[in-house]
Amino acid sequence: MAQDNKATDRRRARVRRTLRARAYGKPRLSVFRSSKQIYCQIIDDEAGLTLAAASSLEKSARESLKTGADVEAARAIGKLIAERATAAGVTDVVFDRGSYLYHGRVKALAEGAREGGLNF
């Protein structure tokens, strides 16, 4: 168990280090997924502010989605974060997948955000 956590921590640190090197002052789209929900937020690291956030726990999302833990929900949340980001004046972001592989729900969220108008 401890070995798995070490590998996850190393992967997360490696991804963040690469992001900071390539960000050029752009905000980052950070993703967190649990077994039942998915969350994302757009963070401006220079100012230390969250510019926009969306999750499958929100009332509007819960009413329209069957569950918060599938690919359809992730795509819908991606579109929602893109709408909120454009309303906040953000169009270019850096995608921060954290320690998660770019597959399944994480990939669906990214594709939904791209469909919604975010560039990364």
Swiss-Prot record:
A GO term from the CC aspect: cytosolic large ribosomal subunit
Single GO BP term: translation
GO molecular-function terms, A-Z: 5S rRNA binding; structural constituent of ribosome
Stored Gene3D superfamilies: 3.30.420.100
Entries under InterPro entries matching the protein: Ribosomal_uL18_bac-type (IPR004389), Ribosomal_uL18_bac/euk (IPR005484)
Entry keyword RNA-binding: yes
The UniProt record lists the keyword Transport: no
CDD domains per the UniProt record, alphabetical: Ribosomal_L18_L5e
Keywords: Ribonucleoprotein, Ribosomal protein, RNA-binding, rRNA-binding
Superkingdom field: Bacteria
Role summary: This is one of the proteins that bind and probably mediate the attachment of the 5S RNA into the large ribosomal subunit, where it forms part of the central protuberance.
Recorded family membership: Belongs to the universal ribosomal protein uL18 family.
Subunit structure and binding partners: Part of the 50S ribosomal subunit; part of the 5S rRNA/L5/L18/L25 subcomplex. Contacts the 5S and 23S rRNAs.
This protein's name: Large ribosomal subunit protein uL18
Provenance organism: Methylocella silvestris (strain DSM 15510 / CIP 108128 / LMG 27833 / NCIMB 13906 / BL2)
Designated gene of the protein: rplR
